[in-house]
């Protein structure tokens, strides 16, 4: 999950510039995504998440351990692993964009809180993209127990990192 976890904060850190929706509105008269979703954020977030995943892949293929725990594998070979890592990183940001689209439809402005949805949107996106890219790997690695653990831990991690981002001036809201 590290590629998914890191793509969002790096999108916020390096984002800005031209919005993905180009300022266009949907048929309801509201912005499609809003100013918070930019090409620079999308590409830099995917790149940074992918890069973190590449480091994980490299370490796992070398048998690296932390406190006696092996690094997770992302596939039987480098190519398969890189596909999974890219799916996790890109899926996270597309999940976040999907959520933004629906928040705009609900009339919620950029930065408005939508509890649990704000914390788990990128997880769902990462899982969907990863399942589509590598279904066998996904099913064998994201067991119900692992998925439940991710669903429980992610909101706490998300809130913590957002508060840090708020205090260092990267985010406008602490959620």
From Swiss-Prot:
EC numbers: 2.7.7.67
EC primary class: transferase
Required co-factors: Mg(2+)
Principal location: membrane
One GO term (biological process): glycerophospholipid biosynthetic process
Pathway recorded for this protein: Membrane lipid metabolism; glycerophospholipid metabolism
Record keyword Signal present: no
GO molecular function annotations of the record: CDP-2,3-bis-(O-geranylgeranyl)-sn-glycerol synthase activity
Catalytic activity: 2,3-bis-O-(geranylgeranyl)-sn-glycerol 1-phosphate + CTP + H(+) = CDP-2,3-bis-O-(geranylgeranyl)-sn-glycerol + diphosphate
Membrane topology listed for this record: Multi-pass membrane protein
Top-level taxon of the source organism: Archaea
Residues spanning the membrane: 41-61, 82-102, 122-142, 150-170
Biological role stated in the UniProt entry: Catalyzes the formation of CDP-2,3-bis-(O-geranylgeranyl)-sn-glycerol (CDP-archaeol) from 2,3-bis-(O-geranylgeranyl)-sn-glycerol 1-phosphate (DGGGP) and CTP. This reaction is the third ether-bond-formation step in the biosynthesis of archaeal membrane lipids.
Family: Belongs to the CDP-archaeol synthase family.
Name listed for the protein in its UniProt record: CDP-archaeol synthase
